[in-house]
């Protein structure tokens, strides 16, 4: 006996609200119904439906989803053995206090001595005409700070170029003052035995201006009769490079505008017109913040402002000088970036604001350098400043990057030069992702730097241009794999904790350190704080798993159990302990969007779905008797959970919020129902019609609007109006979430009979285009929408936590759908590793 074909639905394992046809027929000679999907068929036991039960229930059709990867026994076994002890809590408080003090002490920049620059300052003769140094304390510093091997420089970090340069400067100075014979002899011996090592060292290890100043000093040493190996072929090559470089420098350029040549004037003394060069002097009296260059100019001109600058620096450091000073903008920007990337910035909000206010007060539309009065901007500081200032709401234009682009569209560190390094290109790349609509310069910067950085990954030498970092390769790999819209705060913190080097150094004219940027205190706090937060998250996750089981959802055999993966979402971005309730509500609401997604996708008949929707609208538990058993479990769990949430919401908001929650869900279920009706009718909507509904059915708005009640702030009507479904901010969140979902799931779903996706709807509107062209269009719409989302995030004048809720929810979708359906297939994808690193694996 045959029965009419029934049409129901089966979800392919994605969270998209789409359907495929499943035809049911009797199996010949069997009491089973055969579910025929394409060429295949599976048998499931048939059970007579009771009154009001649905032939579409899971007793007829059981969808197969991959099981949840994170088992109960694993979650239950979490005892938070790494919980922060009382002593560690005290240590956290101490570290926070010490780092706050570091921020408060930021003045012109903390850095280490430069033996090279100190040697140049020590050359200055007494102003009274006597045969003595004007700064005898600097000569004494040189005498007292020779290293055991006979060299001068940073003892813990050896670069042949750096040590040879500093040693040559010191032995010349001591020779000029006819002192330190023993030190000079040891220095010469070091030079003779170690100079050859420069030949084996990468060119990228060469200090700034080395090929200018080193040959000039070598010539001076020869005149002084110092016994050095002048005939070494490598030394001759350096001299030849200097001559070639000087020939390429037009004389008019040297005096026309400030360039990095001002940093190395001590090596250009035979060609500089000292009267002309004075017009390029910085306001603070220096020449590009370089004590060595400024000392050379003073000895040639006697300029009082030069001397004032040197006195200013020595007043700060006592008996030595650094390789450049001040470093105030550089220090503040990198310190802010450090605490943000390590995930500890919430402890230093006031300090961060003060630092950024300072930087912004010295912002220039041509760009900035490492110091506020530095006349030569660089792309490194400028890009870092543009990104951080923009994300903190300061009004800065991306046009500032045009200063550093040449006629070929390439970006370089300094105007008019061809130098660039991995660290500065990495900062430009990070900056380029924080773009607004229409900012073509940001897109150009992104393409240029991505190309450069990918090439750099294949070239070991490329990683040592401006900074020697613990794992710059790891930083580059992370940035390329997880750009801004795919990088969550906890994941970035975890990665940077592993890559951050508390002993990192930079390379200017010499090797130098920045203790307020590279500091063990930052790392220690980041580790303690990460593990503390993780232990809180583990307890919350255990509670949520118990909620899932006590609600009877383990009996639902048509849906996905993804409590852990879903909890990972809020834990990855609103991770702070004070947002515990927000994470709980976010997770519970998200779980219901998955359950109801699966229910409306495949399990319920259209009549049953309308009954469920009506029950929610009326908030009427009595209608549950008319529902199939599986739907009863859904509604009772839904009803009880959101009544409890509404009760807690009333306490946090000071007013009844049940009606608000009901209205949020009413809109959500209407969107689900519309898609069910489209599927039933095999209707493919237009692209715009599809997007209007699908941006709601993706359910991100529902999750955010309900979770927002539990951020610790009272939601005024004004704030609600700025994040409700009519706001562009929320619409963009839903739109980008929907589009990234579709781009990764449409092919599989189409093969299962799906009729509508953004790609298919666009192809319906444009019958002549190919699928590839339609997909490209969808990606373009998504990328443009993400740029608009950036602008909304930066410019939206609502409390920070609400901005984060909306923006980070959009970003987590980009992460989940990087490779495919990261929710349904999380056990096969990197999401599994992200969950483990965020929730289970403490940092060591």
From Swiss-Prot:
It comes from the Eukaryota. Residues 1-46 form a transit peptide. Mg(2+) 3 binds at residues 741, 745, 749. Transmembrane segments: none annotated. Mg(2+) 4 binds at residues 378, 380. Binds 3 Mg(2+) ions per subunit. Keywords: Chloroplast, Isomerase, Lyase, Magnesium, Metal-binding, Multifunctional enzyme, Plastid, Transit peptide. Its EC number is 4.2.3.18, 4.2.3.32, 4.2.3.132, 5.5.1.12. Belongs to the terpene synthase family. Tpsd subfamily. This is Bifunctional abietadiene synthase, chloroplastic.
